[in-house]
Amino acid sequence: MYNFASTSDGADMIHTGRHFLQIPGPTNVPDRILRAMDSPVIDHRSAEFANLGKEVLEGMRGIFKTSGHVVLYPASGTGAWEAAIVNTLSPGDRVLLFETGHFSSLWRGVAEKFGVQVDYVPGNWRRGASAAELESRLAADRGHAIKAVMVVHNETSTGVTSRIPELRRALDSARHPALLLVDTISSLASIDYRHDEWGVDVTIAGSQKGLMLPPGMSFNALSEKALRVTENAKLPRSYWDWQEMLKPNRSGFFPYTPPTNLLYGLREALLMLREEGLANVFRRHDRHAEATRAAVRAWGLEIVCEEPREYSSSLTAVFVPEGHDADKLRAVILEHFDMSLGAGLSKFAGKVFRIGHLGSFNDLMLAGTLCGVEMGLRLAGVPHKEGGVMAALNSLAAPQKKSEPATMAR
């Protein structure tokens, strides 16, 4: 007979139910997408595959809100960073990049490894890119030595969202021809973004956040100006070359063996986003972000982002009080409640924890997440006030704007 007596001595906690993955990406992959990916691999030179390729490339245009080309790579977002650089720049070119957090710093490193000169505009990691600073620097660049402006739209390490339309207006006001390159890895399909309307030349994105997929795919959305510039860009490129990609893309194919099962998942993700409607997706993320901030305020803790207009709708980064360790808090929450929160990165290591609320997410999931945080604060001995969860529930219960018809117009 089976012996169903416990084999645990109580030293190790046995977790039941699903793990709560509340880092700001990779995010929870919905069952629908998992089932779609669980399909036989097909011939990637077949008519069936061509239909799949054309469908997902067209669908991604709707997500980026562009009528232009979208390039898809089997790579993480870092690959799409590199692709944006090598297709538009030459050795010795100058670019302007705003320090908004850990990931702007990493993007700077990629550019510098290719011999690009980076004018790194310093920041305190608590505010987004400054349109006034951008206009001032571009106005001073009368010889147009600056070839590109590089901005992280939503800084995943800090929960700060830069205001891209204001940066575009600064470029236009300065009458400067620099390209505008924008990283939307943690904002695409979570926060309103408009590639064409906002005059962005290259948008960078990844699969593992708002698109609700596993890691493994990344994207560049391209303006016609970016495509013209690439003809004279001298940085070495092969795998990342847009022109090599766009030729077979016209018929739904790729110049490499594509990640077929991820493309199945992407097709299902696009269908889910279309069913909900992008405007409603953004509204849902806004609600969950505001409810999370209500909880943080009720706890008496400090939100990293200093400017309310720059609050992120995909994650909230929170300081722990001086003298306490955010990583120890995260460890307590993981041990007791089987929930993962995002760590503080670089200079915020041990000082900040990050709550992800993006992708496939609903009110009850948020309530459970915030319950786990509040119980963890108590268990870890982190000074806080009670009532954060109730503040979030009250926020969620507030009257909502009427949902819009589910459309995903380009």
Predicted regions located by residue number:
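Conserved PLP-binding catalytic core of the aspartate aminotransferase-like
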Residues: 302-336
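Active-site C-terminal subdomain of aminotransferase-like
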Residues: 28-29, 208-298
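A glycine-/small-polar-enriched, mobile loop at the entrance of the PLP active site in fold-type I
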Residues: 18-74, 78
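Active-site phosphate-binding strand-loop segment of PLP-dependent enzymes
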Residues: 129-188, 202
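Conserved active-site segment immediately N-terminal to the catalytic lysine
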Residues: 196-208
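PLP-dependent enzyme catalytic core of the Aspartate aminotransferase-like
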Residues: 4, 347, 351-410
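Conserved beta-loop-alpha segment that forms the PLP phosphate-binding cup at the N-terminus of a helix
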Residues: 67-96, 100, 104-108
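N-terminal glycine-rich, Lys/His-bearing helix-loop that initiates the first secondary-structure elements
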Residues: 1-40, 392, 400-410
